[in-house]
From Swiss-Prot:
The keyword Kinase does not apply. GO terms for molecular function: metalloendopeptidase activity; RNA endonuclease activity; zinc ion binding. Binds 1 zinc ion. Zn(2+) binds at H112, H116, H122. Its EC number is 3.1.-.-. NCBIfam families: rRNA maturation RNase YbeY. GO terms for cellular component: cytoplasm. InterPro entries: MetalPrtase_cat_dom_sf_prd (IPR023091), YbeY (IPR002036), YbeY_CS (IPR020549). This is Endoribonuclease YbeY. Keywords: Cytoplasm, Endonuclease, Hydrolase, Metal-binding, Nuclease, Ribosome biogenesis, rRNA processing, Zinc. The gene is ybeY.
């Protein structure tokens, strides 16, 4: 059992907390990860731009940011993985540009962010990028097929 905390700062009805929680559960299940706490924040471009500027020195919006914590406080049931922040407007625009349904782009960004929390990094080397993106694609296809079968989510 995992603890998934979702903070949705926008009224975008096409991306529900239920959908995000279910997607995160499926991602963690695919990775055989249990008893973790993860925080997902769904926000706007100006908020993610400010976070990106403050923490990465990049004064521009982005699709997803990850902040790994990876600690297990004494007597706390869960290992805390960290926080994933996604800009919904950025994701929607990006989905349109690459020809992916909006909800599938959110799934892709959740996978990407969670992999970063687990220590994967596509910016360190080409080999690490290959490993990360290969795993990301594998998980995406698995989760995508699950959600295509359960379109009532």
């Amino acid at each position: 059992m995992n603890r998934i905390l979702i903070n949705k700062e926008l009224g975008d009805r096409s991306i529900t907390k239920k959908f995000v929680k279910e997607a995160v559960e499926k991602i963690l299940e695919h990775l055989n990860i249990d008893n973790v706490e993860i925080s997902i924040t769904l926000t706007d471009d100006s908020t993610i731009k400010e976070i990106n500027r403050q923490w990465r020195g990049k004064d521009k919006p982005t699709d997803v940011l990850s902040f790994p914590i990876d600690e297990k406080p004494p007597k706390y049931r869960y290992r805390i993985l960290g926080d994933v922040v996604i800009s919904l407007p950025y994701a929607k625009k990006q989905a349109e540009e690459i020809g992916l349904p909006y909800r599938e782009e959110i799934i892709r960004l959740l996978i990407h962010g969670i992999l970063h929390l687990l220590g994967y990094d596509h910016e360190r080397s080409e080999k690490e990028a290959q490993v990360m993106f290969s795993l990301q694609d594998e998980i995406f296809e698995n989760i995508r097929s699950y959600f295509s079968r359960t379109t009532q989510t």
